[in-house]
A protein has these predicted regions:
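N-terminal phosphate-binding loop and flanking beta/alpha elements of the actin-like ATPase fold
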Residues: 1-34, 57-61, 65-263, 277-298, ...
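Hydrophobic residues embedded in beta-strands of well-ordered beta-sheets
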Residues: 13, 23, 49-50, 271
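Short beta-strand scaffold segments in enzyme catalytic cores
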Residues: 13-17, 40-44, 272-276
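Phosphate-binding glycine-rich/basic clefts of nucleotide- and phosphate-handling proteins
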Residues: 30-31, 35-45, 50-58, 62-101, ...
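Flexible internal linker/loop segments at domain or repeat junctions
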Residues: 407-409, 415-418
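Short, hydrophobic alpha-helical segments
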Residues: 496-500
């Protein structure tokens, strides 16, 4: 029985197989020649026509058409009885017969109803479940490039993982089960092709908390969705492991002796922390619950930093902070809604015609509307995901540079924004304060003090983040070097091998 580790991330996902000796990373994105990860975003699209409307909607439209025909029959009858000329009566009689034929021609009425509904339908009005059931899927870089070329042809789900613990109705749950099942089935297919054998089981990483406010209720829902998706994708067995504990199992392979270790995993969507007793002698045991001294987590990830950098570093060049004629500022919600790539209702609202009209009206009551016009361009062309992605690239560049020039020419020719490492620090400070509070919580809940610390996840590559954690918090604690992007998934693969 073959088992793989799956790091299903907020920003990127990864699959690794461990044979007991070495790790094999599964290539997931053919357009990414260097790495083994794949964007977690999914583009669901229609190349030609949109899907037909649901049966209930068609039947309601048919009933409406029948009411209109019935009214026309009544009017024709009135005309017949009021007509004096036999020829005129014959004309009304023919009209009545024709309308009665239309009234009872159900197939023709259904075709007409579908045609009218399709004509009036826009992509944003299609429920997500219907989109999942009828649309085509594009993953990774291919999906993101397709989205950039034809945003009006589909919908980009920027981070499916961010919705798993949220408040969802029945159809929305089924939609995300369908989306994630497609992704997991693709991961399984890639693994089987590259390993040359059937993959039956998986250990999937999970954050300590999937959602910021729904607590254990959100966690239960998220695990249910992931479990159903894995089954639908063809896995016969699936287990879950807290992501910081998975990272601990990877670093445990390098330790010469028993060591109490603090793991700080700062990923794209969440920050997860644990204090754990690691031991080379116990590394092959399946159940390590007694070794976990403390674990905590929260939805505080790199995506929050990206959105914060948009608001602090980019939005001021797009009209944020400008005053209207009445002295009030341009509504700041314009810009938070623009960044809401992980909030489908908010983003759908931002892309609506009414929202664009509201921005246009605001442009008419400010002295210099040129900056706000950039926001309108983003709104009209559905460029939110691209703006947030630009902020992510800026954040990564500022890990090694003091200043950068960020090109935003897809919004406006020659539109560049200067961003410094100092401005990034200011943008990240509120977020970093919350991360530090989470570290304090984990340390206070642990019965033992850590001897070393491992900081992992994409945000661990930022010197701003590491310096902030060591300032008056982790001072003097030796730091274990690790692979920031692969430690979690390699640890998941180690655990998967125990289940195989």
């Amino acid at each position: 029985m073959t088992a793989i580790g799956i790091d299903y991330g907020t920003s990127n996902s990864e699959v690794v197989y461990f044979d007991g000796t070495a790790h094999q990373h599964i290539k997931l994105d053919p357009l990414d020649k260097k790495g083994n990860k794949i964007r977690s975003s999914v583009f669901i699209y229609f190349e030609d026509e949109l899907p037909p409307p649901p049966d209930a909607m068609v039947e309601a439209k048919v009933a409406q058409l029948q009411r209109v025909i019935s009214e026309q029959i009544d009017k024709a009858k009135d005309g017949y009885y009021s007509a004096k000329d036999p020829k005129e009566q014959a004309m009304y009689s023919d009209r009545i017969d024709s309308l009665r034929g239309d009234l009872h021609n159900k197939p023709a009425l259904q075709r007409k109803a579908i045609a009218q509904l399709m004509h009036a339908m826009s992509l944003d009005e299609i429920p997500l479940l219907r989109l999942v059931e009828h649309g085509k899927f594009a993953f990774g870089e291919e999906g993101f490039r397709r989205f950039l070329k034809m945003p009006d042809k589909g919908r980009l789900i920027y981070s499916p993982k961010n919705f798993l613990g949220a408040s969802l109705d029945g159809d929305q749950k089924q939609a995300f089960i369908g989306i994630i099942a497609k992704q997991l089935a693709y991961f399984k297919q890639c693994a089987e092709q590259q390993l040359g054998k059937v993959v039956n089981n998986a250990v999937i990483g999970r954050p300590v908390k999937f959602h910021g406010t729904r607590g254990e209720e959100g966690n239960i829902q998220a695990i249910q969705i992931m479990t159903e998706a894995a089954t639908k994708a063809g896995f016969s067995g699936v287990n879950f492991l807290d992501e910081p504990i998975a990272a601990a199992y990877k670093i445990e392979q390098t330790l010469p002796k028993d060591t109490t270790t603090l793991i700080v995993d700062i990923g794209g969507g969440t920050t997860d922390i644990c204090c754990i007793k690691l031991s080379p002698e116990r590394s092959n045991q399946l159940d390590r619950k007694d070794d976990v001294l403390s674990v905590t987590g929260r939805r505080l990830g790199g995506m929050d930093c990206d959105k914060s950098l948009v608001l602090k570093g980019i939005a001021p060049e797009m009209g944020m902070g400008l005053k209207m004629i009445n002295g009030l500022p341009v509504p700041p919600t314009y810009f938070s809604d623009m960044c809401a790539v992980d909030n489908i209702p908010a983003l759908t609202r931002f892309f609506s015609d009414d929202y664009g009209l509201d921005i246009s009206q605001t442009m008419s009551v400010i002295k210099e509307p040129a900056q706000l016009e950039r926001l309108l361009i983003v709104q009209e062309n559905k460029l939110s995901a691209r703006v947030v992605n630009s902020a992510r690239l800026a954040k990564e560049l500022l890990s090694s540079k003091q200043n950068i020039t960020l090109p935003l020419h897809y919004i406006e020719d020659d539109f560049d924004v200067e961003i410094s490492q100092d401005s990034l620090k200011k943008a990240l400070k509120p977020w970093l304060d919350k991360v530090k509070a989470l570290v304090v919580e984990c340390l206070e809940n642990s019965s033992e003090k850590p001897e070393v610390v491992m900081i992992t996840g994409g945000m661990s590559l930022s010197p701003i983040v590491v310096d902030a954690l060591y300032e008056n918090l982790l001072t003097g604690l030796p730091r274990l070097e690790n692979d920031a992007f692969n430690s979690v998934c390699e640890g998941l693969a180690i655990q998967a091998a125990k289940h195989a």
